[in-house]
Amino acid sequence: MKPFRFSLKLALTAPLALALAACGGDAGGDLAGDVIAPIAAPDGTNWGETVTVSDADGYVLGNPDAPLKLIEYASHTCGACANFSATAKPGIQEYVATGVVSFEQRNLVRDPIDLTIATLVRCGAKENMQTLSDLAWQNLQETFNNVNANNAAYQAAGELPPEQRFIGIAQAAGLIDFFAARGLSADQQRACLADTTTIEGIANNSSSQANDLGIQATPTFLLNDRKLDVNSWSEIEPLLQRAGARQE
């Protein structure tokens, strides 16, 4: 799998039949450290509801200055990413609540549907981005079903002007109705999907970061900027504990 490069002449050729196949990282790394004491959130706040946008344009859940920073490079059309979302989030929330661990979600865009969803989950408040991503992963198979059922409309979207193209993709995939039922109005979505400058930024950030960090698969995880050779929560949690996110 190669990162998707944005083009105003993009061909809508997402490999839908293969999109649920698991992908994973291929580099190694481990960290070891002393126990890190919990870090209190500022008065009137809690880390589980704290979201910031990083310099890398990722969405960080938790303490932005957490000593342990877990980063996921994810695709919204990756079945393994959907599985991680379903199995890992309760555990991640527990670690984030301590202030010791933050969880940052970054995009590794692999196809036009992925880029469309990546745009839509960023369309509202930053606090909702990861939640909307999780909901989109839960709906992944239905999204593929919609595109396959509406393939003519999906392909026709590629011939639309740039500011209409991703609206066409979203309509063919059933995403406008899906996100409208989850708090993003249809007009709000269309405005975001017509913003080709923002869309190009998402795709270009994905491509440049993948090249700079040598990331070629999703999901890929970094812990304190060190690439991990695992991609499941059952493998990641022990690494967090070894790095200091554990009790005495």
Residue spans of the language-model regions?
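C-terminal cap of thioredoxin/glutaredoxin-like
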Residues: K2-F6, G24-A40, F166-E248
